[in-house]
């Protein structure tokens, strides 16, 4: 960031879906200052290219786009490292929580408001990371943003779903209990 007082500027750590898909789509379709010129269905429209994103939060927050191992151009460099270190839900969450902790420390961002944002499978990742950061790194987040959280059981396109099933469904129905 180029802001003098980093402690007041929020930081958002962004993960795309996948597994396998890099964070490019979070950058170029959702949160970046420029986005692809696409229609509401996600198809390119003419003129092809990019356009300004009036919804980008870059003017009020720093965004860190993360490509976990084997997404985007991220690969295991040392062939002696066991694949189990990075692959699997728990392994993924463990090493990414450690990486986030290191990143926050090295960039002196402990006092900054911290947010995780995940899209599709990234929603599963950030849900697990929120817990791991709190329990293992003593890092309490200011928020978690879920984009297209189909992996959390709220996919209303499934024929057997009412749009409020799975573990998140109970939380979504909670307000109905109090009415």
Please provide the spans of the model-predicted regions.
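Active-site nucleophile loop of the alpha/beta-hydrolase fold
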Residues: 68, 145-154
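N-terminal cap/lid subdomain of alpha/beta-hydrolase-fold enzymes
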Residues: 1-87
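Glycine-rich nucleophile elbow surrounding the catalytic serine of serine-hydrolase chemistry
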Residues: 118-130
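Conserved small/polar residues in nucleotide/adenosyl-binding loops
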Residues: 177-179
């Amino acid at each position: 960031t180029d802001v003098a007082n980093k402690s007041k500027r929020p930081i958002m750590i962004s993960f795309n879906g996948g597994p396998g898909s890099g964070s490019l789509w979070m950058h170029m379709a959702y949160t970046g200052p420029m986005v692809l010129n696409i229609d509401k269905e996600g198809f390119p429209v003419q003129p092809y290219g990019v356009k300004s994103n009036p919804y980008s939060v870059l003017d009020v927050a720093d965004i860190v786009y993360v490509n976990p191992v084997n997404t985007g151009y991220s690969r295991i460099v040392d062939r002696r490292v066991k694949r189990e270190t990075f692959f699997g839900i728990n392994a993924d969450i463990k090493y990414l929580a450690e990486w986030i902790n290191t990143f926050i420390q090295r960039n002196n961002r402990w006092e900054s408001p911290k947010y995780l944002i995940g899209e599709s499978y990234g929603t599963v990742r950030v849900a697990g990371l929120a817990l791991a950061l709190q329990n293992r790194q003593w890092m309490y987040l200011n928020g978690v943003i879920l984009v297209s959280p189909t992996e959390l059981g709220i996919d209303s396109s499934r024929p057997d779903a009412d749009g409020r099933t799975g573990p998140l469904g109970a939380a979504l129905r909670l307000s109905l209990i109090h009415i």
